[in-house]
Curated annotation (Swiss-Prot):
The protein's name in its UniProt record: D-alanine--D-alanine ligase A
Biological-process GO terms, alphabetical: cell wall organization; peptidoglycan biosynthetic process; regulation of cell shape
Gene name in the database record: ddlA
The keyword Cytoplasm belongs to this UniProt entry's keyword annotation: yes
Names of required cofactors: Mg(2+); Mn(2+)
Species annotation: Brucella melitensis biotype 1 (strain ATCC 23456 / CCUG 17765 / NCTC 10094 / 16M)
GO cellular component, one term: cytosol
Function recorded in the entry: Cell wall formation.
Residue positions binding Mg(2+) 2: 313, 315
Domain ATP-grasp: 141-346
Primary location recorded for the protein, binned into one broad class: cytoplasm
Enzyme class: ligase
Length: 353
């Protein structure tokens, strides 16, 4: 921090199917970083996995196809080498902390978190165990079920073991939702009613992952809340918010989330009885701990008409876009976007010390 500012590398883009969502999220993070406090260094992770130095100009992040690459030094405690297109490599200014805004595989699954640990550089956000456990919906379900938390009934599907449609219908009823086990943002998710739907869902799902989940349909409201951990380990759980997909979308799909501006209605806070909301918040905190998460997560639920609370999933790098729920529920709970960033950085520095 020679300049007196904290040098924070913001990773965005990435190799996953959520690449474009990451760019939207990182743009908001860059806008929220206080320039008086932070020297933000955006680094674009290409779809091939290269780390290229980027720039934030006029409110937009550049996405270079080539240029200077940034390479962390193992055990370097923030040292990094820049490899330019031409000329000799040189040592970059010391990195104080990495802030990954990478959704899905290779960013939210413990991979980047492990790289930061090997390089001995602090990282904002969830660490290795929670990231790996939460991203894999199959593993996450097994862990939270073991802890006594309720989830939707499901069947795990691999390329080697694809059950017959009739068997799934008997086990789960109709409709069924097919989803990649290790993707977010509703990428590759399909609502299945017929054998033809099932075959199409299998073909598409296996593009994104080698493991899929078939889940029962639950007629319920979709409710989410945010969890934020301070550097001392105390958890703050936000008020709950509700997502109501438009009638033009049969579920909370990728298009409803990010493409169609009128794809969803977001109600913050959700209109829930106090007792139900308090139970949701308590389950969110428990699930966060059960999966070994730290720092932050968004926890998603179904709430049925008879007020049964069903845990859906946990996202350790929730969307940071204008339409994202995490920051809306935190704001209504009294925590602003810049304050969330500050707390994530403080937590990462404390964990890395």
């Amino acid at each position: 921090m020679a300049s007196g500012k904290m040098r924070i590398v913001v990773l965005f883009g990435g190799r996953s199917a959520e690449h474009d969502v990451s760019v939207l999220s990182a743009t908001n993070v860059m806008n929220a970083l206080d320039p008086a406090k932070y020297e933000a260094v955006p680094v674009f992770v290409t779809r091939a996995g290269q780390w290229l130095l980027s720039r934030f100009v006029n409110g937009a992040l550049e996405k270079p196809s080539s240029g200077a690459e940034l390479c962390l030094v193992p055990g370097g405690c923030g040292r990094a080498i820049v490899v330019p297109d031409a000329g000799a490599p040189y040592e970059a200014d010391k990195i104080d902390i990495i802030f990954p805004v990478l959704h899905g595989l290779h960013g939210e699954d413990g991979a980047v978190q492990g790289l930061a640990q090997v390089a001995r550089v602090p990282l904002a956000g969830c660490g290795i165990p929670g990231s790996a456990n939460a991203l894999d919906k199959d593993i996450a379900k097994r862990l939270v079920n073991e802890a006594g938390l309720s989830t939707a009934k499901s069947v795990t599907i691999t390329r080697e073991e694809v059950p017959a449609f009739s068997a799934l219908e008997q086990a789960l009823g109709l409709p069924i939702f097919i989803k990649p086990a290790r993707q977010g943002s509703s990428v590759g998710v399909h609502k299945v009613v017929t054998e033809a739907d099932y075959q199409a869902a299998m073909s598409d799902g296996f593009i994104y992952d080698d493991k899929l989940l078939a889940e029962e349909f639950i007629q319920a409201r979709e409710v989410e809340c945010g969890v934020l951990e301070d550097e001392g380990g105390a958890l703050f759980v936000s008020r709950a918010g509700e997502i109501v997909p438009a009638e033009s979308h049969c579920f909370y799909s990728y298009d409803a989330k990010y493409i169609d501006a009128d794809g969803t209605e977001i109600k913050v806070p959700a209109e829930l009885p106090e007792q139900v909301e308090n139970e949701i918040r308590a389950i969110a905190a428990k699930a966060f701990r059960v999966l070994g998460c730290d720092s932050m997560a968004r926890v998603d639920f179904f709430v049925t008409a008879d007020r049964r609370i069903v845990l859906n999933e946990i996202n350790t790098i929730p969307g940071f876009t204008d339409m994202s729920m995490y920051f809306k529920v935190m704001a209504v709970s009294g925590v602003s976007y810049p304050e969330i960033i500050n707390r994530l950085v403080a937590h990462g520095l404390a964990r890395g010390s």
